[in-house]
């Protein structure tokens, strides 16, 4: 992540620019420039080694004007309060634009979850749920999965929160497993929305899916589902990336095989090398953004398209699946 870039300052600048274009006085939108509440918590966890590590967690509630705050929880080594504030702000704007009666919230823990065992991950999640329990709830703030979090983590979170309040409270989070009240289709929903956006784009511009070369940055819940569904749509997916790097193939990748492989939580760096050219790490993700493609889909972290690489992008269309 570019440490010189402050995502919250960027979010505020965009609001100011939009307000100026609309001719609004700052009195009309000043409340949108600051979060209602931001919480930082320390999360001590006894690791499998016996050593205690203390992790930093965050929960930000940007606005509850339209209803309870809504927004995911991400686990990432680079997560910080400014990133979480920006994401909460964007959630408030998205819910408002979509006409959904929710406000904007976001949470995160500064951690590389790939370093943690399942037991350590559960312990960290439970600590976090207990720590932020006083400010969340089905009528106050409802978390959900985000980067590096999933239904299992939501189940642990829900259980820990329920312990804290003294009753089973499944409505405290969305993105839960079906067995405890989750929604059928929720896991694929965002990626399916991306696919439908691409389908509408093709219809509007009179393009055939089979003629479209697509690059997808990100192979998690959003990116992985997008790759699978675009393959079913008939698009030629020529590049996919994850945190380990990018896999590129001019002839097109086997979308179903990549989806099955990734569903087992395996990284692309270990995928069949005969499938294409693998470029490791940040270099791979940078190469994907400027590869020869018709449609580029950023579906990972924010701030990937910058002033430095924007002019190098060859894609005719960019479908925005990431947060910022």
Residue ranges and their predicted role:
Residues 182-290:
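Glycine-rich phosphate/diphosphate-binding loop of Rossmann-like nucleotide-binding domains
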Residues 295-324:
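ADP-ribose/adenylate-binding Rossmann-like module
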Residues 114, 152-154, 221-232, 310:
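Short glycine/threonine-rich loop-to-helix capping motif typified by GTGT followed
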Residues 163, 199-207, 299-302, 324:
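Conserved helix-loop functional segments at active or binding sites
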Residues 1-184:
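N-terminal ligand-binding/catalytic initiation module
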Residues 136-138, 207-211, 291-293, 310-317:
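Short, surface-exposed connector motifs at secondary-structure boundaries
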Residues 2-6, 201-202, 316-324:
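Adenosine-phosphate binding glycine-rich loop
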């Amino acid at each position: 992540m570019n440490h010189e870039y402050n995502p919250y300052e960027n979010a505020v600048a965009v609001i100011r620019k939009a307000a100026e274009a609309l001719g609004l006085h700052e009195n009309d939108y000043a409340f949108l420039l600051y979060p209602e509440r931001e919480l930082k918590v320390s999360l001590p966890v006894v690791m499998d080694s016996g050593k205690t590590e203390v992790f930093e967690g965050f929960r930000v509630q940007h606005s509850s004007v339209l209803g309870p705050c809504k927004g995911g929880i991400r686990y990432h080594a680079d997560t910080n309060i400014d990133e979480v504030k920006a994401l909460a702000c964007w959630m408030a704007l998205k819910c408002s634009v979509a006409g959904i009666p929710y406000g904007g919230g976001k949470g995160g823990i500064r951690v590389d979850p790939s370093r943690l065992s399942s037991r350590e991950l559960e312990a960290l999640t439970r600590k976090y749920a207990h720590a932020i329990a006083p400010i969340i709830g089905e009528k106050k703030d409802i978390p959900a999965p985000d980067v590096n979090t999933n239904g299992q983590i939501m189940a642990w979170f829900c259980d820990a929160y329920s312990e804290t309040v003294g009753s089973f409270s499944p409505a405290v989070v969305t993105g839960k497993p079906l067995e405890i009240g989750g929604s059928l289709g929720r896991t694929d929903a965002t990626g399916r929305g991306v696919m439908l956006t691409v389908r509408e784009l093709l219809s509007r511009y009179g393009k055939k899916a089979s003629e479209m070369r697509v690059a997808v940055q990100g192979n998690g819940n959003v990116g992985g589902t997008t790759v699978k569904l675009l393959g079913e749509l008939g698009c030629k997916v020529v590049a996919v990336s994850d945190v380990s790097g990018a896999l590129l193939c001019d002839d097109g990748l086997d979308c179903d095989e990549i989806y099955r492989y990734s569903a087992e939580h395996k990284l692309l760096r270990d995928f069949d090398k005969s499938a294409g050219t693998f470029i490791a790490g940040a270099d791979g993700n940078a190469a994907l953004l400027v590869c020869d493609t018709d449609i580029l889909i950023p579906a990972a972290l924010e701030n990937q398209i910058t002033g430095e690489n924007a002019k190098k992008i060859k894609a005719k269309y960019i479908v925005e699946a990431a947060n910022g």
